[in-house]
């Protein structure tokens, strides 16, 4: 996962920094590429659920989706923060707000569907992918806000300190989930 995230980020950064392709263009192109991947995946497999990735073909679709997600996330995060001149903190708030809105909507719709005894899986799959797509620009906005110089709208912690903060947070989360098992899904709820 880390390698594919780095590749997706580097693709966007190289297109914008070395080839002069605008953030608007890269955002649009990667949004289209991601949409085509989702459509192609669904047409071939009739599902986009990550719980049904049980074949090599589905795994290939998944990793292609992840690659485009990271490329799109980098482009859109930079577009909002830099090109639209909103700054890293505002971009962070926008992406966090969108994630919260989708999560809240998911749980409201889930409740309505449960009352009406309707199938909930499409709502869950859609919510998952929308939130997943938005986590990349959120993470990039947080990283940029922490690492960039204060004159550029950041906190000026630098790349090394920011990386150590992220690494520490990941380690704490992994240790916590390993010890508490709170991330395990009850097989009767699937």
Q: What do these predicted regions represent?
A:
Residues 1-190:
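Polytopic alpha-helical membrane proteins, predominantly small-molecule transporters/carriers
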């Amino acid at each position: 996962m880390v390698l594919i995230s780095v590749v997706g980020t580097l693709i966007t950064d190289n297109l914008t920094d070395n080839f002069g392709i605008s953030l608007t263009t890269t955002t649009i192109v990667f949004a289209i590429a991601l949409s085509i991947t989702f459509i192609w995946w669904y047409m071939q497999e009739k599902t986009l659920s990550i719980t049904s990735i049980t074949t090599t073909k589905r795994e290939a679709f998944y990793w292609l989706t992840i690659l485009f997600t990271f490329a799109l996330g980098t482009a859109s995060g930079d577009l909002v923060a830099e090109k639209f001149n909103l700054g890293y903190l505002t971009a962070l708030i926008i992406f966090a707000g969108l994630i919260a809105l989708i999560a809240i909507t998911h749980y409201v719709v889930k409740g309505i569907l449960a009352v009406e005894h309707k199938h909930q899986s499409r709502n869950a799959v859609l919510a998952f992918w929308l939130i997943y797509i938005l986590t990349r620009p959120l993470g990039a906005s947080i990283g940029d806000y922490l690492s960039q110089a204060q004159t550029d709208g950041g906190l000026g912690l630098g790349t090394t300190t920011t990386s150590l903060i992220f690494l520490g947070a990941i380690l704490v989360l992994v240790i916590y989930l390993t010890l508490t098992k709170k991330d395990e899904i009850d097989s009767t709820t699937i």
